[in-house]
């Protein structure tokens, strides 16, 4: 069974290195929650490539652009961490926030 993995700060150096490991081990990991601030290009790329169940974007302007762009995506684009508190627990969390 795949492990649910969350990355807090997915577009930074540690987050990007973590996604490389996920990409090389697709049979072991299911991207669950990715969190980023405002790097539009990297966020778009990660949604397309990894298809996390949730993607939380802290910056409001970026959130609005991304949510419009990916409104038909299976990834749920959110702007508030509180919206996922009631969701199931993930197996692995990588905190890559400064």
Task: Describe the function of each predicted region.
Residues 67-98:
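A structured beta-alpha segment of the ubiquitous adenosine-cofactor-binding alpha/beta core
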Residues 11-13, 19, 62, 75, ...:
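Residue-identity detector for threonine
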Residues 8, 34, 58, 78-80, ...:
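Structural motif
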Residues 32-39, 43-72, 76:
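Glycine-rich nucleotide/cofactor/substrate-binding loop typically near the N-terminus or early
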Residues 1-51:
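N-terminal Rossmann-like dinucleotide-binding module
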